[in-house]
Amino acid sequence: MPVKVTMDKIVALAKNRGFVFPGSEIYGGLANTWDYGPLGVEMKNNIKRIWWKKFIQESPYNVGIDSAILMNREVWVASGHVASFSDPLMDCKECKSRFRADQLIEDYIKEKGLDISIEGWTNEQMMEFIKEHKVPCPKCGAHNFTEIRKFNLMFKTYVGVTEDSKSEVFLRPETAQGIFVNFKNVQRTSRKKIPFGIGQIGKSFRNEITPGNFIFRTREFEQMELEFFCKPGEDMEWFNYWRQFCMDWLVEFGLKRENLRFRDHKKEELSHYSTATTDIEYNFPFGWGELWGIANRTDYDLRQHMEHSGEDMTYTDPVTGEKYIPYCIEPSVGVDRLMLAFLVDAYDEEEVEGETRVVLRLHPAIAPVKVAVFPLSKKLNEAAYKIYLDLKKKFPAEYDESGSIGRRYRRQDEIGTPFCVTYDFDSENDHKVTIRDRDTMEQIRIDIDQVDKYLEEKLKF
């Protein structure tokens, strides 16, 4: 019988084992900020590494970029973020709590089991629903809300010593615009022909009204985005290609297919720049949630930046001489919620010799520690430690000499370490060690000088 995975179990494991800590904890914290501990940063880096390998390094089409977080304010005017990047905000007049009106309604609909979609609703329609159904405040139960108003999600700051409109800038709410404004630079210097893509990994910031569910939705987050430019008319073919590519990537690196689904956006849901959008959703303990968004952004962004900047964003086909503004397909995923999905999907409990064994069945490429080395006895520390130091040159490794071997295995199982190497008294004579597999718990004896080759083969992706 499959174990029931709860958010409480995942959060407890993450905090207790050094994956994720509350931000600014010694000062009482800062709501919905998280720091990644020794295991968390390794796991995040592994996720970014395998995304980069599959989407950029191994792709004959794609190249990378690392654009600035702070950009000219006009970038966000052109993209539409200054005018329309907002959520519907309302306050409870009784307890002063703030809510997103659409989420308030969606939670009410879910609770009541109603079959209603509010996608595309105006503020007026949402307010009418709240009044008609007497939707209560989730905090205090009152039905006394302010009118709904727009709340811009961008963090505003200033460059230089004066705080006026000329020095106003924003922390970027997405990495995509840094790619669009560099389209001509990248195309010219890389000499790429359409179709080609530009990818990047970086921090983004959104002043979310109601962040939550641990690291699923935070105000500071990391994105992995690809903007793939193609000829108009070939856009849906590439849209379907990247849609499937993203799903295959998730399954290849360990997510169970039954916990994933495609959700195509209805016409009324589509963003103003999109003609087609599909979300790959994951079945989290709190329900289905967006994991990866794949959007056909058409030529909207390049056209907007061409109009606002005066820079020519057209592409000339080197064979036919045809000029056009390329269409863009965007697969965009958040590293933090991807890490949460991998933790949830990998978490398992089983009974072994009357005890509960907690194990993270992470794909070896994602596991923060690849191998742990144990001496069977402290008398064997010196030889075992030398093996550990040699392996650490090639793999993230841990050394553990305290407690019984069984207890040491359990500690590594809980953090997802795929392999454990034990140096015992026989090792001194036969120059072999025991390697134990995390998932099967099977053990094999292998020559000490073959351990690194064995691990390289097993950890290859």
UniProtKB/Swiss-Prot annotation:
SUPFAM superfamilies named in the record: Class II aaRS ABD-related, Class II aaRS and biotin synthetases
Main location: cytoplasm
Residues involved in substrate binding: 100, 174, 221-225, 330-334
GO biological process, one term: glycyl-tRNA aminoacylation
Sequence positions that bind ATP: 206-208, 216-221, 290-291, 334-337
Molecular functions (GO terms): ATP binding; catalytic activity, acting on a protein; glycine-tRNA ligase activity; protein dimerization activity; transferase activity
Subcellular location: Cytoplasm
Matching Gene3D superfamilies: Anticodon-binding domain (3.40.50.800), Bira Bifunctional Protein, Domain 2 (3.30.930.10)
Disulfide cysteine pairs (residue numbers): none
Enzyme class: ligase
Keywords recorded for this protein, A-Z: Aminoacyl-tRNA synthetase, ATP-binding, Cytoplasm, Ligase, Nucleotide-binding, Protein biosynthesis
Pfam families, sorted: HGTP_anticodon, tRNA-synt_2b
GO cellular component, one term: cytoplasm
EC number: 6.1.1.14
Reactions catalysed: tRNA(Gly) + glycine + ATP = glycyl-tRNA(Gly) + AMP + diphosphate
Family annotation (InterPro entries): aa-tRNA-synt_IIb, aa-tRNA-synth_II, aa-tRNA-synth_II/BPL/LPL, Anticodon-bd, Anticodon-bd_dom_sf, Gly-tRNA_synthase/POLG2, Gly_tRNA_ligase_bac, GlyRS-like_core
PROSITE patterns cross-referenced by the UniProt entry: AA_TRNA_LIGASE_II
Physiological role: Catalyzes the attachment of glycine to tRNA(Gly).
Family: Belongs to the class-II aminoacyl-tRNA synthetase family.
Subunit structure: Homodimer.
PANTHER family: DNA POLYMERASE SUBUNIT GAMMA-2, MITOCHONDRIAL, GLYCYL-TRNA SYNTHETASE/DNA POLYMERASE SUBUNIT GAMMA-2
Record-given protein name: Glycine--tRNA ligase
